Amino acid sequence: MAGLSSWFRIPEKFKILLILPVQIVMNFIAIIPFALTWYVGMTNWVPQLTIDWWRAQFIGPIAFVYAINDQIFLAAVARTLFIGAVVVPIEFLLGFLLAYVFLGKFIGRKFVTLVAVVPMMVVPAAGGYVFYLMFVESGPVNGLLQIFTGISISFLSNPTWALISIMLADIWQWTPFIFLIMSAALLSLPQEPINAAYVLGASKWYAFRRVIIPMLKRPMMIALLLRAIESLKIFDYPYMMTQGGPGYATQTITMNLYESGFKYLKYGKTATQSLIIFIACIIVAWYAVKPLRAAQRGE
């Protein structure tokens, strides 16, 4: 008992004991569904053929070969990566620019800042429906185009314009996310190095490039990483605006998995493809945070 009481007096060990039950429960909640998904992904389970998942034919790692050979799935992956490669840099540049402009004091700054973050508070499904009403053939966007140019564009039925419309909606909603992160980062910057640069004769542009940007490296990388991961989950806008169409022209990873699992009931194949995406995201995130860890060790 004496040894046990002395163990409790050690702050670090006592803290571990306090969080241990919660950690065990959380691990249990996370591991069981993951293990079940992994097993189902190794089968060809289709409820119409085999109602019980444990009776489905076990096909092993060959399931990954079947999943990767799905051309519609691969096209959805490529399309999602393309959307992310376009919208994330644009959102970052716009968000950072807004944060830097709003850094100064001016009349109505708080109100303008509040208006700027409103899109992020909108439910994505509702935002998708609003953009659908805007870009539909008889919507206000085409109405304005006909008034000023005399032309009409099939925004949601043309594959290229449908993809552009979805990306515009995504940029509208997620630019405020970058804006908030970079605003907080800019406000937390120490002013001494910046003022010292001005005293030494540096121009605003030079101080911005050589002093401010290096100090913002970590917040920038965090914002880009979080937004890049989030862009892989885009579902609401393609679903609400185009239903993945025309054809499969705007179908993303999440839409493909949704249709494969809930529409065609190919649970085994859907589980395998979900695991592929999960593993790929873990690998990318692992290498993406390496510079952050290196910067932290260097401080």
Can you name each region flagged by the protein language model?
Residues 11-299:
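A structural signal for multi-pass alpha-helical bundles of membrane permease subunits
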Residues 1-10:
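Short, Lys/Arg-rich, polar N-terminal cytosolic tail immediately upstream
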